[in-house]
């Protein structure tokens, strides 16, 4: 599918315009970053793995009532998605202690939590994606109370679905991050600036629908092999554990093993 001008290039993806102003092409790169881009590298075919994994998981979630920006997979590195105005927040859901939570609370990694922990983070590399709460968000007009309630509900729905999905594949879903965006309900596409993936300073007053955006991949999830706790995600890059490409390929193999059977065919 031919693409138009580059709208935005981030650390892991590029967004391109299409002939339809309501749709963009999301292209996955092999570039890898960690610690808010302080560490950089390349993971061979990471873009291919993440695009295919995300396509399968978005399709799976759509089949379970989660509305996403995903339209279809175009090729090995690209997917067609709805054009969103990204809410300047990242959601993190934690099922097992690891990473930032273990460091913040001074506890060991690997403790299974008695209930999932939900976190809001302000989407800002410069500030290190700080942990925030509802009051910060509402005071800064980053989202409305109704939007926050919807995002929270959808995030837990995603967690339930993905935990079941990966459990069947002998993988523990340790934690993951999600991003959401606004899709105009009246057929008017977002302005060019808002389609870049950069956050808006305020919530828009127009009628919109909140959709799950970005990607769902080993870049955005912590995945441990059940029983061994072997890391199958970007922590292998962050912590110089080696075998990074093999871990991504292993997740792809397990995801595609049954994803298409569960959802029919890839859209």
Residue ranges, per PLM feature:
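Active-site loop/lid in soluble adenylation, ligation, and acyl-transfer enzymes
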Residues: 2-122, 255
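A short glycine-rich, hydrophobically flanked beta-strand micro-motif that places a catalytic Asp/Glu
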Residues: 72-77, 166-183
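Short Gly/Ser/Thr- and charged-rich N-terminal loops/segments
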Residues: 189-204, 267
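C-terminal helix-cap and adjacent tail motif
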Residues: 216-260, 264-267
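Phosphate-binding core of ATP-grasp and ATP-grasp-like enzymes
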Residues: 111-128, 159-172, 216-221
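A long amphipathic alpha-helix within ATP-dependent nucleotide-binding catalytic cores
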Residues: 142-174
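Short histidine-centered catalytic/ligand-binding loop motif
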Residues: 38-48, 131-154
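Conserved metal-phosphate-binding beta-hairpin within the catalytic cores
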Residues: 93, 173-184, 208-214
């Amino acid at each position: 599918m031919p693409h138009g001008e580059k709208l935005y290039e981030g650390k892991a993806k590029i967004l391109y315009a299409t002939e339809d102003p309501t749709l963009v092409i999301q292209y996955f790169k092999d570039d890898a970053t960690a610690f808010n881009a302080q560490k950089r590298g390349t993971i061979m075919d990471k873009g291919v793995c993440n695009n295919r994994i995300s396509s399968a998981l978005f399709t799976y979630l759509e089949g379970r009532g989660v509305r996403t920006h995903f339209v279809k997979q175009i090729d090995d590195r690209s997917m067609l998605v709805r054009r969103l105005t990204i809410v300047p927040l990242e959601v993190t859901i934690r099922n097992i202690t690891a990473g930032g939570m273990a460091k913040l609370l001074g506890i060991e990694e690997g403790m299974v939590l008695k209930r999932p922990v939900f976190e809001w983070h302000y989407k800002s590399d410069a500030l290190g994606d700080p942990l925030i709460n509802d009051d910060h968000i509402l005071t800064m007009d980053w989202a409305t109370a109704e939007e926050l309630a919807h995002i929270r509900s959808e995030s837990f729905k995603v967690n339930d679905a993905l935990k079941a999905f990966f459990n069947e594949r002998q993988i523990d879903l340790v934690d993951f991050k999600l991003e959401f965006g606004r899709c105009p309900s009246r057929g008017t596409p977002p302005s060019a600036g808002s389609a870049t993936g950069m956050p808006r300073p305020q919530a828009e007053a127009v009628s919109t629908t909140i959709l799950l955006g970005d990607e769902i991949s080993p870049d955005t999830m912590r995945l441990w092999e059940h029983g061994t706790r072997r890391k199958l995600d970007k922590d292998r890059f962050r912590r110089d554990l080696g075998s990074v490409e093999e871990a991504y390929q292993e997740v792809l193999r397990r995801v595609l093993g049954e994803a298409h059977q569960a959802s029919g065919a890839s859209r």
